[in-house]
């Protein structure tokens, strides 16, 4: 696979070519995903739960993300890598710049930050330094205490309008990509069509430019109950490779997510 760039991902949006993304945390799985044709991998702070065994993403440190980013980059040299800035690692511009440098040096193409209007000045400062940024709005796991748990966001009209405003403000400030998590399908469609940057959905319906799943959910190895928007692709496949290829096919052809995976 040739190296994937942000320009290519933006072209896919313009040409209405959907793409599949996935989380990964190590060399072996990232190499497998890359060989299957996954163009975008997220080194997410979800590793706090899937790898470290915590009950949330909050204990994850910047050193954890840097370590796993290095491993994933070795396995997927040409894949577009997005790495999370974990909880309280970007509470001001100085801290955000310092920790972004660590992550980019570890091999990421882009950093991801959760939040809305309060992030604007930080986004603008990073963008002015030509750093690629992925925003993340809707259900933002680093703020699950404030949100009252892991709940769908944007159901009420005023909440939906707030998310639309935040998406537009973040794009204006300089984000290059946006993740929408657990918002109604119609709202995700409106936001996606309002932005010129690629929009990736998780639990937000099929009308975004791309989809992302946590690898453990996709492969059916998550401990306990999984979110209703996930799908175990390994159930219908006889190998991990075929499960990933099926996931890619269903995303590219708007089969997944279906209505039962959406809100």
Curated annotation (Swiss-Prot):
CDD domains: KPHMT-like. The keyword Chaperone does not apply. The active site is at 181 (proton acceptor). Mg(2+) binds at residues 45, 84, 114. Its EC number is 2.1.2.11. Its cofactor is Mg(2+). The keyword Metal-binding applies. GO terms for molecular function: 3-methyl-2-oxobutanoate hydroxymethyltransferase activity; magnesium ion binding. One of its GO terms (biological process) is pantothenate biosynthetic process. Pfam families: Pantoate_transf. SUPFAM superfamilies: Phosphoenolpyruvate/pyruvate domain. Transmembrane segments: none annotated. Binds 1 Mg(2+) ion per subunit. It catalyses: 3-methyl-2-oxobutanoate + (6R)-5,10-methylene-5,6,7,8-tetrahydrofolate + H2O = 2-dehydropantoate + (6S)-5,6,7,8-tetrahydrofolate. Catalyzes the reversible reaction in which hydroxymethyl group from 5,10-methylenetetrahydrofolate is transferred onto alpha-ketoisovalerate to form ketopantoate. Belongs to the PanB family. This is 3-methyl-2-oxobutanoate hydroxymethyltransferase. It comes from Buchnera aphidicola subsp. Acyrthosiphon pisum (strain Tuc7).
